[in-house]
């Protein structure tokens, strides 16, 4: 993509309303624009990152055997009344009426609707287990939206729901999603710690939040530092096999959010030198809630013995749009964002330091075309901005690699390649640069 043809509204000054790094950098880098309190338009650069994050989530859900569908944003109020959640959910729920005075709501979550869909079609244990998921925009009317996409009112979520005949099967589904989440965050360059947590309005008696340690986190968290070094399951993990050793490894060390923190247990189980007491950002949560929705909605399954009983359920959420902010909180410096390659909007930023110079233009065109042919996403700065402005812009938007082409270097047969994460610079030939992206 040529920058001269792209839409990238960079801000030179720090926005006054931005309280945390991710909000400030997303606004400055032209990723988002606030349209109302807690509601953002995703501009082209930000939307590319959002799509990359969404795709990783989708790939790992599919790998774990989950099946994608799409549910609407608007839901009938009567559906929520079946489970008693319509009145219990509180003012965060946006309640509306259509022209026929039918009561609707803008979905903050989808347990009720997915249960209604499931009960309409599934009757027999032979159709179990199932895990269904969708990626959809949600709305929760936060009293005080803040921190940009980290705590907005409208946000993109991946919600998965499991359906099993009994508790044993439901816990197997829970384990699948637990492992899938470990892989999701690792692929995005994040160290996410599963921590015991409250179930909140979702309900149930088993839940883990996946937490990224950050000073800007919304809650206090407590854990054994050894959890930071545990191995992540690889892409060859057998989701139909026994995952319990992985779960045991990740849950045997102390890790809890402040809502369920047991100070006495923390001190007895964790040596002083291994205790971490920090703030944390929640980027996902898994729940086992049993019959909480299937029982009141009479979503019954006929078992092998011919008897009917409610299915055992679980739900599993990933904050897709929130993850974009969380990645920035975890990966930035004074100059700007440092994107992990897997979620970067472009892999390479190509800077032409003297647009109009025949040799420089030709070298940039060759690099651009050859990298594009290899499937490398390139943002080519072919504008007439001064070199310092181009360098600052590339550092701000955080692309993993910068290729800098100018007349002086070309005269020596060299161009400069900079790795954003380390700041390392190399002088290479065009052929050597291209070679870096072919292996």
UniProtKB/Swiss-Prot annotation:
Family the UniProt entry places it in: Belongs to the class-II aminoacyl-tRNA synthetase family. ProS type 2 subfamily.
Which reaction does this enzyme catalyse, per its entry?
A: tRNA(Pro) + L-proline + ATP = L-prolyl-tRNA(Pro) + AMP + diphosphate
Source species: Beijerinckia indica subsp. indica (strain ATCC 9039 / DSM 1715 / NCIMB 8712)
The enzyme's E.C. designation: 6.1.1.15
Protein location: Cytoplasm
This chain's protein is named: Proline--tRNA ligase
Q: Main localisation, per the record?
A: cytoplasm
Q: How does it assemble?
A: Homodimer.
Paired cysteines (S-S)? none
InterPro entries referenced in this protein's UniProt entry, alphabetically: aa-tRNA-synt_IIb, aa-tRNA-synth_II, aa-tRNA-synth_II/BPL/LPL, Anticodon-bd, Anticodon-bd_dom_sf, Pro-tRNA-ligase_IIa, Pro-tRNA-synth_IIa_bac-type, Pro-tRNA_synthetase
Question: Kind of enzyme, top EC level?
Answer: ligase
Question: Which biological process, per GO, is one annotated for this protein?
Answer: prolyl-tRNA aminoacylation
Q: Name one GO cellular component term.
A: cytosol
